[in-house]
């Protein structure tokens, strides 16, 4: 099952998370050339902070700032964890 947070609005992102056999990050961004590595770093550091692995993270970015990406990811992960409690 997939869990998501965010939107396709300008300056936002849609993050979708699901369980996986390995940690995999897929990023689609209008600013990928300039900020693709930074977006990936924000996602990886957030997963590391939360000690999470084996997830598929899909990020459709429309120019979101780092704190927006992080908060959307945390919200999607929270929705997923609530389902399994």
Question: Positions of the model-derived regions?
Answer:
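N-terminal intrinsically disordered, cationic/polar leader segments
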Residues: 1-85
């Amino acid at each position: 099952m997939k869990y998501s947070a965010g939107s396709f609005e300008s300056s936002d992102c849609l993050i979708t998370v699901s369980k996986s056999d390995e940690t995999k990050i897929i990023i689609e961004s209008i600013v990928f050339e300039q900020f693709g590595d930074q977006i990936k770093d924000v996602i990886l550091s957030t997963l590391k902070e939360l000690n999470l692995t084996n997830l598929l993270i899909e990020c459709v970015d429309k120019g979101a700032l780092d704190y927006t990406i992080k908060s959307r990811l945390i919200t999607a992960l929270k929705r997923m964890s609530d389902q399994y409690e």
